[in-house]
Amino acid sequence: MRPSGRNNDQLRTLKVTHNFTKHAEGSVLIEFGDTKVLCTASVVAGVPRFKKDSGEGWLTAEYGMLPRSTHTRMDREAARGKQSGRTQEIQRLIGRALRASVDLTKIGENTIKVDCDVIQADGGTRTASITGASLAIRDAIDYMKQNGMLDEQTSPLMSQVAAISVGIFNNEPVLDLDYDEDSNAETDMNVVMNSNGGMIEIQGTAEGKDFSEEEFAKMLGLAKKGIKEIFESIF
């Protein structure tokens, strides 16, 4: 039995609020159960030096957690003077996943800067960030079209992206782990896919106990089922 009472193949309740903030070109509050992440996509003129004069755009992502998004307060990373390795790893993952969905040759020399800020954490913050950010990017691209920054016929979005966590909890494969499950899981895996059914990234780690190829296949099957439901529900 899962602590939440959910079936092993059951997602948490999903909720998306578009235009959650008024300044960003795209903004989405995404909620997976008690995990809540604010995802914004800002369009900035210009590109990094390595992209200058290429005619192409760029997309980058940042990730952070509010001090009391967790059970006990943590200091802001800005106050500590550096980002943790975990934060750097997560924002690289978010950036990679999102760049796989956007044709950067079609947005001109503009940069889409994605910010994912965890308001409340209850497991799956990185996968929620990827999913919410993909929606925010779609809204930002619509803004660019409506404001003459892109031709109405231009479609930089090659696909949408969604992600979900799976794992082995109490010796059983489960979908969409919350904090209680994630902190006690024998295996934790994150899967990122696009709306065309393609795989973008799989991260899987055994926590003190290995997992079999059969268990991997079951977890992957759960992830594919969950991501399909996410696309049908909120995209």
UniProtKB/Swiss-Prot annotation:
The keyword 4Fe-4S does not apply. It catalyses: tRNA(n+1) + phosphate = tRNA(n) + a ribonucleoside 5'-diphosphate. The keyword Nucleotide-binding does not apply. Coiled coil: none annotated. Phosphorolytic 3'-5' exoribonuclease that plays an important role in tRNA 3'-end maturation. Removes nucleotide residues following the 3'-CCA terminus of tRNAs; can also add nucleotides to the ends of RNA molecules by using nucleoside diphosphates as substrates, but this may not be physiologically important. Probably plays a role in initiation of 16S rRNA degradation (leading to ribosome degradation) during starvation. Homohexameric ring arranged as a trimer of dimers. Belongs to the RNase PH family. This is Ribonuclease PH. It comes from Francisella philomiragia subsp. philomiragia (strain ATCC 25017 / CCUG 19701 / FSC 153 / O#319-036). The gene is rph.
